[in-house]
Amino acid sequence: MKPSISWGILLLAGLCCLVPSFLAEDAQETDASKQDQEHQACCKIAPNLADFSFNLYRELVHQSNTTNIFFSPVSIATAFAMLSLGTKGVTHTQILEGLGFNLTEIAEAEVHKGFHNLLQTFNRPDNELQLTTGNGLFIHNNLKLVDKFLEEVKNDYHSEAFSVNFTDSEEAKKVINGFVEKGTQGKIVDLVKDLDKDTVLALVNYIFFKGKWKKPFDADNTEEADFHVDKTTTVKVPMMSRLGMFDVHYVSTLSSWVLLMDYLGNATAIFILPDDGKMQHLEQTLNKEIIGKFLKDRHTRSANVHFPKLSISGTYNLKTALDPLGITQVFSNGADLSGITEDVPLKLGKAVHKAVLTIDERGTEAAGATFMEIIPMSVPPEVNFNSPFIAIIYDRQTAKSPLFVGKVVDPTR
């Protein structure tokens, strides 16, 4: 039997909030120049990542429109772009085109440079931010990799390489799970449940972040309330509430309320609450241009916002999810991964993606701190997120790259 790659793409978004990184105040001018170059490289791939995000979201909705959806398009795209370094022919073309890159418009070197700088930006230290990504390459100890591939995944994608004895599947699982558990600060344990006996190579990607709301909710105002999953199902949820100044407005073309909430730093969460029966219309209409306008045209108004505390997750078989986007050959016996190793023919045996989203009141460094603001005396609108809504987490520093995309159908599941 031909050996196969078992590829676990792993992701944790532990998010009370999210903040990307800043340069230190005493950063030298050369550092600022370097950051500007990184930003420009990120800008080149940001539109492609945005298109990929919405394409994949719609595909996941098509496969299941009655469950929570949550994934990191940046994480998935990074992992497959890294894998593409070892592919050739149709396999190679399918991956890059499936991720939304037209190589007649952007050079492949620019694609990898964009991901390289994206990862550098995410992993830059900041005292307001816990945002880290990591790539791990786990190689069977008697498998010889092509030097060029090994060098490129290390240099372009900051991937660590580990020698593993895959014939001892329990030990291999322990090594891989330990790498992930450490990288996600213990938030994801036992990611790998089983390994195919023919596995000779595993690629693992994770992303972890946790941040703080710029304007937190007061936990004393959180009360149990109804959340309407659908016309026949209602669940009880802890509902956060705050009367204050919000970037919230009704968009008639989407038949939806749109709420933008900032995290400390350069990240923004966009929550979109459609009118009853308008979720499908919203999902078909939403695109990167509309989101771009929301992020550009910011204004606040007084509002009374109710938002559920939640912790949801999504686990996906990417073979099924990416098939309609044209990424198929890498999973088949016709896969050409000869850029990884010439020892044995390989195919991608398994690609699993997991993401977790947590939202609560926390938003200040000091426990029990109080946030106060002055609001106009006019009657504010009530915006109650007590039915399914869409959530998108954007990193403004990396040219509005969508870090996470999801739909909350049931906050209790």
Curated annotation (Swiss-Prot):
Record-linked InterPro entries: Serpin_dom, Serpin_fam, Serpin_sf, Serpin_sf_1, Serpin_sf_2
List residue numbers at the site (Reactive bond): 377-378
Function of the molecule:
Inhibitor of serine proteases. Its primary target is elastase, but it also has a moderate affinity for plasmin and thrombin.
Q: Where in the cell is it found?
A: Secreted
Positions of modified residues (Phosphoserine): 33, 378
* Short name of any one Pfam family annotated for the protein: Serpin
SUPFAM superfamilies in the record, alphabetically? Answer: Serpins
Q: Which GO terms describe its molecular function?
A: serine-type endopeptidase inhibitor activity
* Glycosylation sites per record: 65, 102, 165, 266
Keyword Phosphoprotein in the entry? The reply is yes
Q: What is the lineage of its organism?
A: Eukaryota, Metazoa, Chordata, Craniata, Vertebrata
Q: Which GO terms describe its cellular component?
A: extracellular space
Q: Which CDD domains match?
A: serpinA1_A1AT
Q: Which SMART domains match?
A: SERPIN (SM00093)
User: Would the keyword Phosphoprotein be found if you checked this record's keyword annotation?
Assistant: yes
Q: How does it assemble?
A: Interacts with CELA2A. Interacts with ERGIC3 and LMAN1/ERGIC53. Interacts with PRSS1/Trypsin.
Chain intervals for the UniProt region annotation (RCL) = 368-387
Q: What is known of its domains?
A: The reactive center loop (RCL) extends out from the body of the protein and directs binding to the target protease. The protease cleaves the serpin at the reactive site within the RCL, establishing a covalent linkage between the serpin reactive site and the active site of the protease. The resulting inactive serpin-protease complex is highly stable.
Q: Main localisation, per the record?
A: secreted
- Keywords recorded for this protein, A-Z: Glycoprotein, Phosphoprotein, Protease inhibitor, Secreted, Serine protease inhibitor, Signal
Listed name of the protein: Alpha-1-antitrypsin
